[in-house]
Amino acid sequence: MEQAKMEGKIKSWGVSNFDVNDMTKLLKLPIGQHCATNQVRYNLGDRGIDYDLVPMMNENSMPVMAYAPVARGDRLGSDLTKQKVLQGISKKYNADVFQILLAWCIRNGQTIAIPQSSNAKHVINNVKAADIQLTEEDLVKINTVYPKPSVSEPLALW
């Protein structure tokens, strides 16, 4: 990847599904700091990286690239779109629950969310999610229902 970067074939490169141990090893390499991002599964139902990986990446000024940031909505069985707290917050912002899920995912400015879109309306709604600034009160409510992990957890994978 470094060769492709030096040849101007790519602007930057990243990794996918690296846990803390993998990132530690990568960052010790001479080219490790050239890594632009780590793409991992991250959403309200899969917050394991909040314990140690997100802080580590923030310390190294490396954004998280979140795949499945809306957890596929109801299809994972977690019924995120039917959760009362999320419905209440979505009404507050005149948004849908998917927009709240995306707004939560990018709340700290250190996460790049890559949601799936099946039509133009979804794309527009996804973009509008970036305009939602969740308040501390919103985050407390969300954390009550979907708490940050208190111990290290393995990466969530597809």
Predicted features along the sequence, with ranges:
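Beta/alpha (TIM)-barrel catalytic core signal, keyed to glycine-rich beta->alpha loops juxtaposed to Asp/Glu
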Residues: 1-158
